Amino acid sequence: MPHHTASAESTGTAATRLAVRLLDAWSARSRAEPAGAELPSDPGVPVLAALLYATGDPEAERSAARAVAVWARDAGRGPAHCGLYDGGLAGTLVGLRLGAGVHPGLTPVADRLRDHLVRTAPTLGHRREQVAFPDYDLIVGPSGTLLALTAGTSPTPAQLGPFADHLTGLCDADALPRLRTGQYAGHPNLGWLDGRINTGTGHGVAGVVTALTAALRRLGPAPGPASGLAPALGRATRWLVRQSFDDARSIRTWDGAGLDDAPPPGGARARQAWCYGTPGVSWALWDAADALGDRETADWAAAAFTSLAERYDERFHLFGDRPSDLLALCHGASGVLAVADAFARHAALPAAAALRARLLTHLRTRLPEVAALGATGMGLLGGAAGPLCALLTADHDAARTWLPCLGLR
């Protein structure tokens, strides 16, 4: 339901005006410097433009149309892997699909790219053991590609099948041994994860769970090629539950990797975001349990999120040296806002509604910082497009068609 209050109306207007200004600046910048810092396939600009276009404001419509036209000119250039983020073609697909609401001529282009992603999926050689992120995750792997196929459209079983089958096969045992990484020994940033199983939404089991849930909602548990979906999803959700613990602030949470039968280190866990920790993981669990008809696990996941929502501390849980760490969807306040909004809307969770209200206020007062972030990046996950999309969706009842990009709905 829209939040019909003076503050919501003014925030919607302020967010819309800022989105127009940032999209216009991005369009001018991209024309002048087509090889800028941003990857051309990131869906942030067309996703924000689609939300802006739907407001019906003439200035917003013109800004959105310009931005989508400029974005489409270079869409698909860049790394061209099949992932949803980091320049992947699944991100291009989302941008084309939602951008088609602004420029309908992009629909057949999106259809051709969708067909390419489905056709080439069996040739990618995804590992089934000793995995790395591209073999399974939401950011650059098949979990994100599957979710991208569901954004703004209704994919067929044949289109989802190659990705759902692979992810189902990775969850064929209770301990999820196939999701144990094996490619990061000696890596300067990811060495900690080598030989372990990532729990998170972006790079871990929670992201796989969101993709399997999306597939189950569309394919159903009926006998046939998708018959293994529900058992695989059940195994993955039970594994995540077993990795949880209460931190020093009495928040039910998760570390970045599974516990491997060891007790968790003591202390409070500051990283509580979409990517890691309670927000993203508890949502993945709740939505999966809801799709499976598992009320006990759904209630458990809602209680886990409530433990965070009632103790969320912006001074502790939002940290980092970059504006994106504080504001963006991946690590920052807008990602927690998007999750709280999903819980409030779909689970009718009072603590989620209260946290949503707090974070709306938090972001309303930080639109100047969002503007500064937009001067350097308009990406969806790490740039200014994400906070603006989250604000327009949670506070101004904008379309939710982009939320599969986060494993939300």
Where are the predicted features?
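N-terminal domain-start signal
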Residues: 2-5, 12-66, 70, 77-91
